[in-house]
Amino acid sequence: ALTDQRITEITDDSGENISTKNVNYCELTALYWMWKNKLCVEETDKYFGLFHYRRFLDITDDGLMAMKAKNVDVLLPYPLLHEPDISEHHSRYIEESDWDAMLQALKELYPDYAERFQEILRQPYLYNYNMIIAKREILKDYCEWLFPILKRTEELSTPKGWERADRYIGYLGENLLTLYFMYHAE
């Protein structure tokens, strides 16, 4: 939590958390908290989701019930179109050295995803904003894949003894969300 003012009942600075990394991870600190404190310990809810302070998925209770009835795995926001492709988009928000660090982390940890990523970067669709509603197991699997990549990216991109205060991990997370769900779309 970046503020002492209480604005919600549940915060990302209790239990197992990375709340102090919020300046870089943005809303992904809340996803980490959900993964470690809800997805891994409770078996009550079938679906979990992440919205954040100014971004949310506009879905009604009836829509959620229909998702459950139709056994929908994942709900993502409409993808944003970036012409000519999403590789152009990331250069506005992400330093090339950080992008290269993420690609290196992918190659080290998940080489099959790294190979597919080059293909996905050439298409125009990006699922922005790190927003999702998904079945428990799918979201848990995504987190188990995502956070080791982000941790390794941080190790490769942050010079020793230097503290960063930008949103680069959050922006990289948007690209990784797109990769993960495009990779698993088939």
Task: Give, region by region, the residue ranges found by the protein language model.
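ER/Golgi luminal nucleotide-sugar-dependent glycosyltransferases, focusing on the catalytic module
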Residues: 1-186
